[in-house]
Amino acid sequence: MGSKESINSKKIWLDLHMELTDNNYETIIKNNENPVFIDFYSPTCGPCQMLTKLIDTRLEKYGEEQGVQVVKCDISKNPKLASAFKIRSVPFTIAVLKDETLKYPEVGLKNETYYFELIDKLAGKGSFLSRLFT
């Protein structure tokens, strides 16, 4: 029975790996027991597309392994969230902790290591690079 519960928990986690929208904000952010990393983007933004590719190919899976929800939000389709987070430039990333505290707001594309180390911080672990060399 324990393994079935694990599978059900995993299924819920995977079901929530989706685009953050004006409509599902409550479900993903307010009801989440894990920190959430949000990437606000525009489909017409070149640097945003680079970050989206990183999220889709590697960062989302890494976040899941570390217990951090990684989501994206298209500001052109979600004006309420863009307004609530006062988005003026993209890409804009921010973390929402379990208690809904906002941390680590960043505008612009950072290097890949930055995002992996931020996931580590949110998970309460040492840096990604330090774990590679120990």
List where the protein language model places each region.
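A short glycine-leucine-enriched loop at secondary-structure breakpoints
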Residues: A84-R88
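Short active-site neighborhood of thiol/selenol oxidoreductases, capturing the structured segment around
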Residues: N31-P43
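Short, thiol/selenol-centered motifs that function as redox-active sites or metal-ligating centers
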Residues: T44-L51
